[in-house]
Amino acid sequence: MSGLRPALSTFLFLLLITGGVYPLLTTALGQWWFPWQANGSLIREGDTVRGSALIGQNFTGNGYFHGRPSATAEMPYNPQASGGSNLAVSNPELDKQIAARVAALRAANPDASTSVPVELVTASASGLDNNITPQAAAWQIPRVAKARNLSVEQLTQLIAKYSQQPLVNYIGQPVVNIVELNLALDKLDE
């Protein structure tokens, strides 16, 4: 019985620190230093939320650039079911999925080069990836240009404008945020 009091007081102290002080402190610091990121990096047009800069969307129309496939459950890019497909490289089901995606992309992009960029046929680990390489976006230019009646040069400039360089050149590669790129495409039509 003599050991119960120190154990209980330690438990209550740690509960207060880890369950109260630490979460409140990190939330307050996040809201103070990074308010846009702490609130979901929401992309707004006026009072309307159009998406998040961190979560991809399922763009399927010919007039939009398509992102990486989503492996989330129930619906594509479901943030409540984030996760990869968990299919090993040796799994025949993964081969079938990739072959089907390649065939669909080639059918939708008949004027594109024959080699389909790998990120357009493989899902990311989170299933929510919103970025592709500028090369993968450029591969889709003929389809988008035809659907929107825009020039290849206009779309090339738009991809260059929305390309983001890595913080350190030798770590990572340039990427294009598909949500922001497609919203910019919609603004061109206005």
UniProtKB/Swiss-Prot annotation:
Membrane-crossing segments per the record: 10-30
Membrane-related topology note: Single-pass membrane protein
InterPro entries noted in UniProt: KdpC
Main localization of the protein described in the UniProt heading: membrane
Keyword Cell membrane among record annotations: yes
Keywords recorded for this protein, A-Z: ATP-binding, Cell inner membrane, Cell membrane, Ion transport, Membrane, Nucleotide-binding, Potassium, Potassium transport, Transmembrane, Transmembrane helix, Transport
Localization per Swiss-Prot or TrEMBL: Cell inner membrane
GO MF: ATP binding; P-type potassium transmembrane transporter activity
A GO term from the CC aspect: plasma membrane
Keyword Nucleotide-binding: yes
Oligomeric form and interacting partners: The system is composed of three essential subunits: KdpA, KdpB and KdpC.
Function of the molecule: Part of the high-affinity ATP-driven potassium transport (or Kdp) system, which catalyzes the hydrolysis of ATP coupled with the electrogenic transport of potassium into the cytoplasm. This subunit acts as a catalytic chaperone that increases the ATP-binding affinity of the ATP-hydrolyzing subunit KdpB by the formation of a transient KdpB/KdpC/ATP ternary complex.
Family to which this protein belongs: Belongs to the KdpC family.
Record-linked PANTHER family: POTASSIUM-TRANSPORTING ATPASE C CHAIN, POTASSIUM-TRANSPORTING ATPASE KDPC SUBUNIT
HAMAP family: KdpC (MF_00276)
Protein name (Swiss-Prot/TrEMBL): Potassium-transporting ATPase KdpC subunit
Organism: Escherichia coli O7:K1 (strain IAI39 / ExPEC)
